[in-house]
Regions:
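Extracellular interaction modules
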Residues: 1
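Surface-exposed, low-hydrophobicity beta-strand/loop segments enriched in small/polar/acidic residues
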Residues: 8-205
Length: 205
C-alpha cells in the first residue's frame, strides 16, 4: 500500500555491519529455564596464548582449558572472564580476558559452558548468504581480538560448510536489526556447539 513501510524490502536492501565479537551466549535451546550460569575452569600457569572475551575455549589433556583452535574438538563454550592473583602485585585480579603468559597457580576461567547454550556469531563470508546455511555445520575462524577492549573477533568460517563433523551447528539467523540480512555479507548466525565436550557422543580427553 502506498506510503506503507515495507520492512521486507528495506531488510533486503540492507548490508550487515562488519563487527565480529566471537561467540556471544544468548540463551538455551528450547523452553527450559536458563540461569546463564558460568562454569569455572583452570588455565595453566604461564600459558602464552591470549584468550579474548567470547573466544571459544576447549579442554586439554592436562585438565585445563585454552583458546580453541580452528577445527579443534572438545569445545566447552566461550570465555566470559578470568580471576587470578597477580604475580607482581599479589592482588586478586578480575579481567574480561586472559592476557597470556601469567605466572599464577590460581588462574580461573569463567565459561558459558552449557552444551545446550545458543550463541550468536558473525560469518566471515564476504558475499550473500542463503537460508540453506541453516542446519549446516561449520568451523570457527580464529583471529586476534580487539586490542582496545579485548573482545574476540573470531568468526564462523563459512568456507567450512558441511553436513559432516564441525565445531558449530547453525540453528537460525540472528534477529539483530543490523546483522540479519541473509542476502548480504557478514550475517550473524545463531549456533550451538556441535563438538561439545559434554555431548554424550564424545569421549573423554
Amino acid at each position: 500500500r502506498k506510503g506503507r513501510y515495507n520492512y521486507k524490502e528495506a531488510s533486503m536492501a540492507k548490508t550487515n555491519k562488519d563487527a565480529a565479537f566471537g561467540l556471544r551466549a544468548i540463551g538455551k535451546v528450547g523452553q527450559n529455564r536458563d540461569n546463564q550460569g558460568l562454569g569455572e575452569y583452570s588455565i595453566s600457569s604461564g600459558d602464552t596464548t591470549k584468550i579474548f572475551f567470547q573466544d571459544a575455549v576447549s579442554a586439554t589433556a592436562a585438565g585445563t582449558i585454552h583458546q580453541a583452535a580452528a577445527s579443534e574438538a572438545f569445545l566447552l563454550g566461550s570465555l566470559n572472564g578470568v580471576f587470578y592473583t597477580d604475580p607482581t602485585t599479589s592482588k586478586p585480579t578480575f579481567a574480561n580476558h586472559y592476557e597470556g603468559s601469567i605466572a599464577a597457580s590460581d588462574i580461573k576461567a569463567f565459561v558459558a559452558d552449557d552444551p545446550y547454550e545458543r550463541f550468536e556469531i558473525q560469518s566471515n563470508k564476504t558475499s550473500a548468504h542463503a537460508q540453506t546455511d541453516v542446519f549446516k555445520n561449520f568451523n570457527i575462524e580464529v583471529t586476534a581480538g580487539n586490542a582496545a577492549n579485548n573482545v574476540s573477533k573470531s568468526e564462523l568460517n563459512h568456507s567450512t560448510s558441511t553436513t559432516g563433523t564441525a565445531q558449530l551447528k547453525v540453528t537460525g539467523i540472528s534477529t539483530e536489526i543490523e546483522n540479519s540480512t541473509i542476502g548480504a555479507a557478514n550475517l550473524n548466525f545463531v549456533v550451538m556447539i556441535n563438538e561439545h565436550l559434554y555431548n554424550a557422543k564424545n569421549n573423554g580427553i
